[in-house]
A protein has these predicted regions:
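Polar/charged alpha-helical tracts
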Residues: 57, 61, 137, 141, ...
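Structured mid-domain segments that build the active-site/substrate or prosthetic-cofactor binding neighborhood
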Residues: 1-152, 156
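Long, leucine/valine-rich, helix-dominated scaffolding and oligomerization segments
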Residues: 166-170, 185-188
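Non-transmembrane amphipathic alpha-helical segments
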Residues: 146-160, 185-192
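Short, small-residue-biased leader/transition segments that mark boundaries at the very start
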Residues: 2-5, 193-258
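Extended, well-ordered alpha-helical segments in internal regulatory regions
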Residues: 175-198
Length: 259
């Protein structure tokens, strides 16, 4: 085919429109004019539009630091593709589920690919010979990063004009607080799984942080989004209530044995 028939292709994988407004807006801008598209320019314009010019650059940096707080559990395979692999929240959910179901029998490599996985190892993409140690190290690094960005979001919130605060909370601040708490929770869950000593203490901390993560996530339910996470318990979703129930049972079981 001649040049006139050549087309640019963009592949986007987003769970839903509401949680990825900025990312999908960036893709739309890219597809409008791919040769002229510049990520920094787009993000600055986006932040000016939705958070005001006075704080646009500050919010830009928060977005960048938020994305770089995610644990990069595997090095990129494609040259020039930064952070190709990150440990997103549904991978956290799989860790809670799989280890929780085999909690009594420790294994340094307890995680298996999901049933429908077509590429071996793709479900988790964890490098190293010891999954549990890699996760503990990764969570310890990542929750510190999320904590710092979440604190900066909290400090910026009252300085934003009232008209910008709702979207800032829903699109950046709440997700960051959610991931911070989730990372703390998984860290303590893994600690309780690997080490018998103070197991109940760490299960209690895992519960405390997972409850906080749920609170942060559900804080974005308002207005037309009041029932946004009502389907969280469906197959393939995180299902925080089920994970909390699992943690309560483990805590109660091991709490009795440690008394």
């Amino acid at each position: 085919l001649g040049d006139v028939y050549k087309r640019q292709l963009s592949v986007v994988n987003a769970g839903n429109l509401r949680e990825f407004v900025m990312e999908l807006s960036a893709n739309a801008s890219m597809m409008w004019d791919m040769t002229a598209y510049d990520t920094d320019e787009f993000l600055y314009d986006f932040c000016v539009q939705y958070f005001g010019e006075n704080h646009a650059e500050e919010v830009m940096q928060l977005y960048r630091d938020y994305y770089h707080a995610y644990w990069e559990q595997k090095n990129a395979e494609f040259p020039g593709l930064e952070r190709q692999f990150i440990f997103h929240d549904l991978r956290y959910a799989r860790v809670f589920k799989q280890i929780g179901e085999r909690f009594e029998h420790f294994s340094p490599n307890p995680l298996k690919d999901i049933v429908r996985e077509r590429v071996p190892g793709r479900s988790f993409r964890i490098e190293g010979s010891n999954q549990v140690d890699s996760l503990l190290s990764g969570m310890e690094r990542t929750f510190g990063k999320f904590d710092k960005v979440a604190q900066r979001c909290t400090e910026l919130m009252p300085r934003l004009l009232e008209q910008y605060r709702c979207f800032f909370r829903d699109n950046l601040s709440a997700p960051c607080h959610y991931m911070a708490a989730l990372s703390h929770s998984l860290y303590h869950f893994l600690w309780a799984y690997k080490y018998i000593e103070r197991r109940t203490e760490h299960l209690n901390l895992s519960i405390e942080y997972l409850e906080k993560a749920q609170e942060m996530l559900y804080s974005t339910q308002h207005g037309v989004f009041t029932d946004w996470y009502v389907g969280d318990s469906l197959h393939g979703k995180f299902n925080i209530p089920a994970k909390l129930k699992q943690l309560y049972k483990l805590r109660d079981r091991y709490g009795k044995t440690e008394m």
